[in-house]
């Protein structure tokens, strides 16, 4: 039988190790990117390193836009706004009780051209949603209760529903917040600089600094590797334990089979002596049988006194039979062990 617990632990250890290596490589890549301390230096850096493609840089600044979006509920101005609306209701389940559920009614997203500005210059940002670490903040969360119309309430109740209301959530990338972006720096046809996702290489958008990103990736890499070592040790332990148990079980079965064969041979020898001898020899063999009783083939100490159902064999004592699941003679499954009284 395959030790699935140990195999699963080893596979988990391999997956965690690969995650750790991936995080470690990402941290090493971020350490090699060109840091742009001031955005006005980007033009000079592009001219010096124009032969390097893609030219990966790390820039920092505050989010800005010429045409920001004003959120409807919170009034926050942002460059990316996502709005979702969920209908919340109670419904009848199969047991007849009411359970709460929800359904998505609306999912809308808006984005305007935006840039990073550090006071010295600005750089436009393209495709930030596909970047690692990109996240929007919750601008507002409003719950609008459903109207109490008698007709509508009756129809919903007949359908097994009770409308609670609509939950509207606005997520926004507000203007003015500081961001760090790691990506490919390019110069477009009209002479403006922009940061975009490279064909190969890292692409990060985060509110953390570059040093914090590298530190976090290093911590995750070490954590994954430590967890991988733990799962490896546990998996090896479980597999080794299974192998040892299997070896001991096979040895026990061989010893048990040897005991059964020895007992059967001894019993056959005694029966042959009793059938071929005279009455005196029968008496002598009876004495021998009394000297060598019908012992349990397991412990070889107690007389066998348990009959196995359904096979009908009797070769063990009641104490040993309580630990068996199959008959030592025919290997059939034991449904019941019945104690017998011998005279």
From Swiss-Prot:
PANTHER family (UniProt xref): E3 UBIQUITIN-PROTEIN LIGASE SP1-RELATED, PTHR47568
Quaternary organization: Interacts with TOC33, TOC75-3 and TOC159.
Protein name, as recorded: E3 ubiquitin-protein ligase SP1
Gene name per UniProt: SP1
UniProt-listed Enzyme Commission number(s): 2.3.2.27
Known catalytic reactions: S-ubiquitinyl-[E2 ubiquitin-conjugating enzyme]-L-cysteine + [acceptor protein]-L-lysine = [E2 ubiquitin-conjugating enzyme]-L-cysteine + N(6)-ubiquitinyl-[acceptor protein]-L-lysine
Post-translational modification: Auto-ubiquitinated.
Gene3D superfamilies recorded: Zinc/RING finger domain, C3HC4 (zinc finger)
Regions crossing the membrane: 1-21, 223-244
Claim: Transmembrane is one of the keywords in the record: yes
Signal peptide positions (record): none
């Amino acid at each position: 039988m395959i030790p699935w617990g140990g195999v699963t632990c080893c596979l988990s250890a391999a997956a965690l190790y690969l995650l750790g290596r991936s995080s470690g490589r990402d941290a090493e890549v971020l350490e090699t990117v060109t840091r742009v301390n001031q955005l006005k230096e980007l033009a000079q850096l592009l001219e010096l390193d124009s032969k390097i493609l893609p030219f990966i840089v790390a820039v920092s600044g505050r989010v800005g836009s010429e045409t920001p979006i004003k959120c409807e509920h919170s009034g926050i101005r942002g460059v990316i706004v996502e709005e979702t609306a969920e209908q919340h209701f109670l419904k009848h389940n199969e047991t007849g009780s009411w359970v709460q559920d929800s359904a998505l009614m609306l999912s809308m997203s808006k984005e305007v051209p935006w840039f990073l500005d550090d006071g010295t210059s600005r750089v436009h940002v393209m495709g930030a949603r596909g970047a690692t670490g990109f996240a929007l903040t919750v601008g507002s969360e409003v719950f609008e209760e459903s109207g109490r119309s008698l007709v509508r309430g009756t129809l919903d109740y007949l359908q097994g529903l009770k409308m609670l209301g609509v939950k509207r959530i606005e997520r926004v990338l507000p203007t003015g917040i500081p961001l760090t972006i790691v990506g490919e720096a390019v110069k477009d046809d009209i002479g403006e600089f922009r940061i975009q996702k490279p064909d190969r290489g890292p692409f990060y958008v985060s509110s953390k600094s570059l040093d914090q990103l590298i530190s976090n990736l290093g911590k995750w890499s070490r954590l994954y590797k430590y967890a991988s070592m733990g799962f490896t040790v546990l998996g090896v332990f479980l597999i080794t334990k299974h192998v040892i148990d299997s070896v001991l079980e096979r040895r026990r079965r061989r010893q048990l089979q040897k005991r059964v064969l020895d007992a059967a041979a001894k019993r056959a020898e005694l029966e042959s002596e009793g059938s071929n001898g005279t009455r005196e020899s029968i008496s002598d063999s009876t004495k021998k049988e009394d000297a060598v009783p019908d012992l349990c083939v397991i412990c070889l100490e107690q007389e066998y006194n348990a009959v196995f159902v359904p096979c009908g064999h009797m070769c063990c004592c009641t104490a040993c039979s309580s630990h068996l699941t199959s008959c030592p003679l025919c290997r059939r499954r034991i449904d019941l062990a019945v104690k017998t009284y011998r005279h």
